UniProtKB/Swiss-Prot annotation:
Name this protein carries in UniProt: Invasion protein InvE
Annotated gene: invE
Organism: Salmonella typhi
Comp. bias regions, Polar residues: 1-19
Subcellular location: Cell membrane
Keyword Membrane set for record: yes
Disordered, as annotated region: 1-47
GO cellular-component term (any): outer membrane
Major location category of this protein: membrane
Keywords linked to the UniProt accession: Cell membrane, Membrane, Virulence
Length: 372
């Protein structure tokens, strides 16, 4: 044996075995520690401690969630409280009113003038003042000023105008976004509707003039939605009797809308009608004009058709008048200013159709004579 070689080999093996032994020992110790820890953790005292700890953690998480939810709710309520105020920058302007009121001194008329400069519409101003009065941290002198200001505004404003403006505000905001219009304009239209004594055709025509013929259908949807909301409101703008009359007017307006759609779509479905005039707005204007002045049908048709009529044959004229007669006959007589006006209109159209038919026959005879 080579001296030293055995001890070297033995040493390396010993190191290897020693390392293995230490690993095994450490592993065994670790296992024993885990077993001991598990035993301790499974003891009744440990279980109670773990339960208390987990409960504390859950309580802390719930408290954090509740605080965040309460904060979001307060922020949402602050925003929602001014949702029916249609004036731009309502919240900053409301704070400005509160700041002005908080300054001691000054006459009520001065406060009123400044408040109206910020909120020109009385419904907006009343909503803002009512909301400010809900605050619990107001000084007594500030609260009394706000109450006096609110009372003054309510007394000076027509109740129907005030309540209607408040009750239709959310609908005005919603439809304002849909139509890309200022909601205050829609609110004004609803107020005008519930107080107007004009004929339904005039009301419908005013909407077209104000909003454009493309929006006429949606504007009526807004009026209907606002009226139903107003009826269900705790502080409605009208009496039951008045609402009954308004619902009848609404029915007439919806009937007018249906007649309008049928009249225009039927006429524009024919190519020779489009040859006369292809504009939807022109035929809509014609129908509304006929409801108000059917005796002028000849001149009204001439305005719509114009010189294009000269380019068409007598046969096409007669065909057009026959179709036009049918669409006018389909209009409910109750939509005319006077119901008997529809029959007078139809009589005039029959006369015009007879003349056109005679011209058509004469034209055919001339054609036959030329061929023979």
């Amino acid at each position: 044996m080579i001296p030293g070689s055995t001890s070297g080999i033995s040493f390396s093996r010993i190191l290897s075995r020693q390392a293995s032994h230490q690993d095994a020992t450490q592993h065994t110790d670790a296992q024993q520690a885990e077993i001991q820890q598990a035993a301790e953790d499974s003891s009744p005292g440990a279980e109670v401690q773990k339960f208390v700890q987990s409960t504390d953690e859950m309580s802390a998480a719930l408290a954090q969630f509740r605080n965040r939810r309460d904060y979001e709710k307060k922020s949402s309520n602050l925003s929602n409280s001014f949702e029916r105020v249609l004036e731009d920058e309502a919240l900053p302007k409301a704070k400005q009113i509160l700041k002005l009121i908080s300054v001691h001194g000054g006459a009520l008329e001065d406060f009123l003038r400044q408040a109206r400069s910020l909120f020109p519409d009385p419904s907006d101003l009343v909503l803002v003042l009512r909301e400010l009065l809900r605050r619990k941290d107001l000084e007594e002198i500030v609260r009394k000023k706000l109450e006096s200001l609110l009372k003054h505004v309510e007394e000076q404003t027509d109740p129907k105008t005030l309540k209607a403006g408040i009750n239709c505000a959310l609908k005005a905001r919603l439809f304002g976004k849909t139509l890309s219009l200022k909601p205050g304009l829609l609110r004004a239209s609803y107020r005008q509707f519930i107080q107007s004594e004009s004929h339904e055709v005039e009301i419908y025509s005013d909407w077209i003039a104000s909003y454009g013929y493309q929006r006429r259908l949606v504007v009526l949807d807004f009026i209907e939605g606002s009226l139903l909301t107003d009826i269900d409101a705790n502080d409605a703008s009208c009496s039951r009797l008045e609402f009954g009359q308004l619902l009848r007017r609404l029915t007439q307006l919806k009937m007018l809308r249906s007649a309008d759609l049928l009249f225009v779509s039927t006429l524009l479905s024919y190519s020779f009608t489009k040859a006369f005039n292809a504009e939807e707005s022109s035929w809509l204007l014609l129908m509304l004009s006929l409801l108000q002045q059917p005796h002028e049908v000849d001149s009204l048709l001439a305005d719509i058709i114009g010189l294009n009529a000269l380019l068409l044959s007598h046969k096409e004229h007669a065909s057009f008048l026959q179709i036009f007669y049918q669409v006018c006959k389909a209009i409910p007589s109750s939509l005319f200013y006077e119901e008997y006006w529809q029959e007078e209109l139809l009589m005039a159209l029959r006369s015009m159709t007879d003349i056109a038919y005679k011209h058509e026959m004469a034209e055919q005879r001339r054609t036959i004579e030329k061929l023979s």
